[in-house]
């Protein structure tokens, strides 16, 4: 059975995150685990003790239990908050049709926890902005780019508001990662049966038209109703126009391309498109095995 891992910190994106999780779980026929990562207790400094009769030894020995008590209290408080947050997630998921999600709370940072994560999963879901960036308009979650870069599984970055996903747009530049994204779309259950568009940003040359036509033919052979869009202009401008003009609900792209188009998403300017995009973004990792429906 496919597995979904939803990462939450209870930010303003959480309600949308849980609805997107329920949508994806229904599409994939998968199980859901909800992960909340809370800050680890800060380490405290133990002053060196002079065992040759230094009077400071007594104060150091008294400080240690006090610091330990503070650290333990902070940890208890963080665990209690995590439990409350996860129960809220379970309640919202149940209302959306997801029964009995696994609830997990771990200390550390989200990139650290995910890097050490051993249980297999097929889709990672998280909000565009976390609780620490909620007050900053259009700020991007500080850990998001790190997570996308290190993930070998697809990452669904959800928008603030949930809208049923009925049409999706694939960014395509003929790179290996773009071809991998096409293959994963065709082979996996997540987007099966939904109409889509394939967009290239470039001049209307015969070569570009042939490349785009080949990508659409591949999708059509896989059972998708695919439309072609070859547009001149900056990739970011073109993609925004296409999304709004044709009412797409999801943007799909490959990760780690060195092309100008996908460098706009993943690279030195990764944050810009995800920051400004008003619809969910599904980033396909190049190392991901395809998703298996029902197994």
Task: Name the predicted role of every residue range.
Residues 94-102, 220-227:
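A short helix-to-beta-strand connector/capping loop
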Residues 34, 102-105, 157, 198, ...:
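A structural preference for short, hydrophobic beta-strand core positions in alpha/beta folds
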Residues 1-68, 150, 163-230, 248:
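Small/aliphatic-rich secondary-structure junction motif
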Residues 108-111, 231-237:
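Conserved active-site histidine-acidic residue motif and adjacent donor-binding/catalytic loop
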Residues 13-27, 103-162, 242-295:
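Gly/Ser-rich helix-loop-strand patches that form or flank binding pockets
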Residues 67-91, 101:
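Alpha-helix-centered segments that form part of catalytic cores
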Residues 216, 234-244:
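A short, acidic, amphipathic alpha-helical segment used as a generic capping/interface helix at domain edges
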Residues 21, 89, 114, 185, ...:
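Aromatic/hydrophobic pocket-lining residues that form π-stacking "cages" and hydrophobic walls in ligand
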């Amino acid at each position: 059975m496919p597995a979904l891992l939803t990462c939450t910190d209870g930010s303003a994106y959480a309600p949308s995150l849980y609805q997107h999780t329920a949508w994806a779980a229904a599409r994939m026929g998968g199980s859901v685990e909800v992960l909340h990562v809370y800050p680890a207790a800060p380490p405290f400094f133990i002053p060196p003790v002079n065992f040759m009769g230094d009077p400071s030894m007594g104060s150091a020995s008294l400080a240690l239990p006090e610091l330990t008590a503070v650290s333990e209290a902070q940890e208890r408080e963080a665990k209690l908050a995590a439990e409350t947050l996860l129960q809220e997630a379970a309640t919202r998921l149940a209302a959306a049709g997801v029964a009995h999600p696994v609830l997990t709370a771990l200390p550390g940072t989200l990139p650290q926890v995910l890097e050490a994560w051993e249980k297999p999963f097929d889709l990672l879901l998280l909000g565009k902005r976390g609780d620490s960036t909620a007050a900053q308009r259009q700020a991007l979650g500080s850990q998001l780019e790190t997570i996308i870069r290190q993930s070998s599984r697809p990452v669904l970055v959800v928008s603030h508001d949930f809208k049923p996903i009925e049409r999706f747009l694939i960014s395509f530049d003929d790179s290996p990662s773009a071809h991998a994204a096409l293959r994963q779309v065709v082979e996996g259950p997540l987007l099966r049966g939904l109409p889509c568009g394939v967009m290239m940003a470039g001049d209307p040359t015969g070569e570009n038209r042939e490349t785009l036509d080949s990508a659409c033919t591949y999708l059509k052979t896989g059972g998708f109703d695919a439309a072609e869009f070859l547009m001149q202009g900056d990739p970011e401008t073109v993609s925004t126009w296409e999304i709004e003009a044709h009412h797409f609900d999801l943007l799909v792209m490959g990760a780690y391309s060195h092309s100008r188009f996908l460098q706009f998403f993943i690279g030195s300017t990764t944050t810009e498109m995800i920051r400004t995009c008003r619809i969910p973004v599904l980033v396909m990792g190049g190392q991901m095995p395809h998703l298996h429906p029902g197994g």
